[in-house]
């Protein structure tokens, strides 16, 4: 039945102590639809879906599955009800193969041995049916992020899920992988599945969703048909105010060169060159955006500038002083700020509090420490100020960084680095995982940093972002700068040509 309701969440409330993450939220999913759950960072989307998938239990409210009231008290209970969740941060074992990860906890045996042959056969059948091409014998650590996500989807299908929850599924994907994922979702719907898509990316909602439920600060605001609202109206429902998609900025007034990179060569672990004779400069008072397909040397370039990887030849100068192959802290102390690409691995210590993370670069200096002792009153009060200024939402500065949503973790890192007032600010994927309101704010802060005379280097896979904030755009391909162009005179299509090694002047 086309209009059959498969999920009904009624007045669902979830409290963590005094903090209310979900406040009487209502959500209905119909069979065969893609229902987008739209909300800004920390709105309570993931909490609500963790309740539906059995990771959390509600404080109040009801959950009905296929017309029956259910107590979903564990992921296994959710799986038995046909509910599967594809998490934003993949739950895979790097040292295991694709097959071993998919069958983990649901192993097929033949006598006392694993029946991998039967498992592989089923995986290949599912893979072909839904357009989820994978190599069953490949190790997880050897496949791309997009491939790893396919493994997560296959895990849910292998367990018989017909209701799939996608939690911010495009946060770590390249544009090409995003397009592939949208098609995979459509394939799943054709095969009778139903999908809840947690996101704050309006273009992706336009591409696949049928209906949208908007959540703001833990409350369900409205459920609308896709065609009933413009992107502007959806953004305003999501954040509760008017939002601008294009950041206004005056023409840059670049001054002296702050960062100068000349003939840079960097080898990867297997000995081949990852960065090849790359030269680039960034001046005070400008934003240089680096555009390129993931894996073309951007990560190695940033690691070299920040002292996290060895340069084989060439030079990196800061204010005309050579900093090539210096230690990371020494580079940081020369007024370099760095927002890393991977916030979990390189940006935060998840077990530490938000306040401790904000103080990571300054804890050993006054006023954060005195006579060799940490001043926790100062550390906590400073964190509270920054959390308010940058709208980092959570129960308080004393909670662990792991308890924040992905977007709020990113805002905490950006707050820490901008607060240090660096001469050079390097920002990798500045708005990955952020909602439209937060994106608008971060873009304004980057432009403000530029206007205050800072040199800003932005690395992003989001071409709209690169075009929006940059004064010059350097396109990287195969470890080399393919071209440096102006955002005013270059289209996304032309950037795409440069990103694959083409020439736009032919």
Swiss-Prot record:
<keyword id="KW-0472">Membrane</keyword>
<keyword id="KW-1278">Translocase</keyword>
<feature type="domain" description="ABC transporter 2">
    <location>
        <begin position="259"/>
        <end position="503"/>
    </location>
</feature>
<dbReference type="InterPro" id="IPR050107">
    <property type="entry name" value="ABC_carbohydrate_import_ATPase"/>
</dbReference>
<comment type="subunit">
    <text>The complex is composed of two ATP-binding proteins (NupA), two transmembrane proteins (NupB and NupC) and a solute-binding protein (BmpA).</text>
</comment>
<dbReference type="GO" id="GO:0016887">
    <property type="term" value="F:ATP hydrolysis activity"/>
</dbReference>
<dbReference type="InterPro" id="IPR017871">
    <property type="entry name" value="ABC_transporter-like_CS"/>
</dbReference>
<dbReference type="InterPro" id="IPR003439">
    <property type="entry name" value="ABC_transporter-like_ATP-bd"/>
</dbReference>
<dbReference type="GO" id="GO:0005886">
    <property type="term" value="C:plasma membrane"/>
</dbReference>
<keyword id="KW-0547">Nucleotide-binding</keyword>
<protein>
    <recommendedName>
        <fullName>Nucleoside import ATP-binding protein NupA</fullName>
        <ecNumber>7.6.2.-</ecNumber>
    </recommendedName>
</protein>
<keyword id="KW-0813">Transport</keyword>
<comment type="similarity">
    <text>Belongs to the ABC transporter superfamily.</text>
</comment>
<dbReference type="Pfam" id="PF00005">
    <property type="entry name" value="ABC_tran"/>
</dbReference>
<dbReference type="GO" id="GO:0005524">
    <property type="term" value="F:ATP binding"/>
</dbReference>
<feature type="binding site">
    <location>
        <begin position="39"/>
        <end position="46"/>
    </location>
    <ligand>
        <name>ATP</name>
    </ligand>
</feature>
<feature type="domain" description="ABC transporter 1">
    <location>
        <begin position="7"/>
        <end position="242"/>
    </location>
</feature>
<keyword id="KW-0067">ATP-binding</keyword>
<dbReference type="InterPro" id="IPR003593">
    <property type="entry name" value="AAA+_ATPase"/>
</dbReference>
<keyword id="KW-0677">Repeat</keyword>
<dbReference type="InterPro" id="IPR027417">
    <property type="entry name" value="P-loop_NTPase"/>
</dbReference>
<comment type="function">
    <text>Part of an ABC transporter complex involved in the uptake of all common nucleosides. Responsible for energy coupling to the transport system.</text>
</comment>
<keyword id="KW-1003">Cell membrane</keyword>
